[in-house]
Design a protein with these regions (language model features):
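Transmembrane helix-loop junctions in multi-pass membrane proteins
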Residues: 5, 36-40, 80-85, 161-174, ...
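Alpha-helical membrane segments and immediately flanking helix-loop junctions
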Residues: 58-91, 117-141, 152-155, 159, ...
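Extracellular/periplasmic helix-exit of transmembrane alpha-helices
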Residues: 33, 114-121, 126, 243-261, ...
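Flexible loop linkers connecting adjacent transmembrane helices
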Residues: 38-65, 87-97, 101, 109-145, ...
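Membrane-interface alpha-helices at helix entry/exit sites of multi-pass transporters
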Residues: 57-62, 94-102, 137-152, 186-196, ...
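Membrane-interface loop-to-helix entry segments
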Residues: 24-31, 39-48, 171-178, 201-251, ...
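Helix-loop-helix module between adjacent transmembrane segments
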Residues: 28, 32-33, 74, 103-128, ...
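N-terminal alpha-helical transmembrane segments of multi-pass membrane transport
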Residues: 1-79, 89-96, 107, 249, ...
């Protein structure tokens, strides 16, 4: 029964993440990159400046520009960076990392565009809080005739929260990492409530504790999520990057060989002639799918957080938000991927998910293996924890749109979300990630269509902002 279900999921996954969706993701990113004049490269220093400057603050919004980015990063920097990269490389070979980079490069322009549009078309909910995202820029930007597409996006957004990035994959990754450290052989097991599958005691205990902690934070709403994210995300990201850079420095002679392996695998050059195209397609599918899972460029989630930023100019928040893709994929995922390829951890039989990355850290860091495993477990737990918080916020905003801001339904949904966190540890790793891929792809489709339709608005708004900025700078210079 379970085998048939997994086979069904694999079939659906192959259909959703076929060539058409991959082509649409790359086309959207390339279109916006070209039309914006490679702005993600030219304006990167300005984006970093806006991150810390007071220049972005405005009257509208609930959190700072930095806070909005941290909420977005809290939702994106999660198991995708540690477990997702490992599963992509194990399934598609080292070449998956190349396609992840390519998707991120053009995805940075996508992230700028969707977050800018979210700020431009945001609105105020009945209780006074700011709400925005693809559902509003589809409805307001494309017109009422496209409201069905906005509702479709919001519906898939709820599904991604419940079954995709938000719950199952994150809590499953956390508890798997904890079990791998405290009880790798599952010597101590328990059957919770007498009906759930038998699991390691460490999994059961950590699952219950995390469910309670998440529930306490979620009750506080957006501002509490923002405060937690602003503290946790930078701290844990710095620790992870330091460990990753240490791995690369201690294995610097292996880096050139790793890049050769990545590029050969990306284009199927190591496969037999007849299987080269097939190997390339698998690497492309897994790399782009996991890249989207990790940085969420094009999915339409980050715009929901960006809409709450205290900015007057939509383009400013777009610039700040695009840094999320740079930090998430081009830095953190690259560190994970290179560590896995350099150490060959992806080739070890019997390892999957977090265990692959753990093995890479243990083999590459010049510290006791238990210490390396503990550091990775800690990073994974905090990354995944903040992702759970961020995706509750995203999916609740989607549900508010679907239900015309019915807070009774939203409150009920919050408890359903918490329940999904409770049962997540008892699901298999492969099923969790396949379900996540499927719903992510479905959520991305309406948003990508909207970004293509509204690319003219993006370009016009961007030109208007930079013209205004140039005039302001010129006036200050003359005075």
């Amino acid at each position: 029964m379970l085998t048939s279900f997994n086979a069904f999921l694999d079939t659906v996954d192959s259909l959703v993440w076929g060539i058409p969706l991959i082509a649409l993701i790359l086309f959207t990113g390339l279109l916006l990159t070209v039309r914006l004049g490679f702005m993600q490269i030219r304006k990167l220093p300005l984006a970093v400046h806006f991150l810390t400057a007071n220049e972005t603050s405005g009257e509208h919004g609930e959190v700072s520009s930095f806070g909005a980015l941290c909420v977005a990063l809290s939702a994106t920097i999660g198991t995708g960076n540690i477990v997702g990269v490992a599963t992509a490389i194990c399934a598609g070979g080292p070449g998956a990392l190349f396609w992840m980079w390519l998707a991120a490069l053009v995805g940075t322009a996508t992230k700028y565009s969707e977050c800018m549009l979210a700020c431009k078309y945001r609105t105020v909910a009945k209780d006074g809080h700011i709400i925005g995202g693809p559902f509003y820029y589809i409805e307001k930007g494309m017109g009422q005739n496209w409201k069905w597409l906005a509702k479709l996006f919001a519906f898939f957004g709820v599904l991604v929260g419940l079954f995709g990035i938000g719950t199952f994959s994150q809590i499953n990754g956390i508890t798997s990492a904890i079990r791998g450290f405290f009880d790798p052989d599952s010597a101590h097991t328990v059957r919770v409530l007498g009906v759930l599958p038998e699991v390691s005691t460490s999994v059961a205990i950590s699952g219950v504790v995390l469910t309670i902690v998440v529930a306490l934070v979620l009750i506080g709403g957006m501002k509490r999520i923002s405060k937690v994210a602003e503290f946790v995300v930078p701290f844990m990201a710095i620790i992870y990057v330091i460990c990753g850079v240490a791995i690369l420095l201690f294995n610097v002679t292996k880096i050139p060989g790793a890049f050769v392996e990545i590029f050969q695998s990306a284009f199927g050059l190591r496969a037999a002639a007849g299987g080269a195209m097939g190997a390339m397609i698998v690497a492309m599918q897994k790399g782009i799918a996991r890249g989207i899972f990790s940085n969420e460029a094009g999915i339409g989630s980050a715009p929901i957080a960006a809409a709450a930023a205290q900015v007057e100019e939509p383009a400013q928040q777009g610039l700040v938000s695009m840094l999320g893709t740079v930090i998430d994929t081009l830095i953190i995922c690259t560190i994970t991927g290179l560590a896995i390829v350099i150490t060959g951890a992806w080739k070890v039989e019997g390892l999957e998910g977090a265990a692959v990355t753990t093995r890479a850290f243990q083999d590459a860091l010049p510290i006791p293996s238990q210490a390396a495993a503990f550091i990775l477990m800690l990073c994974l737990c905090f990354f995944a924890f903040t992702t759970i918080l961020g995706w509750d916020y995203y999916s609740e905003r989607c549900l508010e749109y679907l239900t015309n801001d019915n807070q009774k339904i939203v409150s009920g949904y919050r408890w359903l979300y918490i329940f999904c966190i409770f049962i997540g540890p008892y699901m298999t790793v492969s099923a969790v990630w396949t379900i996540a891929d499927i719903v992510n792809g479905l959520m991305a489709l309406p948003n990508l269509v909207a970004l293509i339709a509204l690319n003219g608005v993006v370009v016009a708004e961007t030109k208007k902002y930079f013209a205004k900025r140039e005039n302001k700078i010129s006036a200050l210079t003359r005075s």
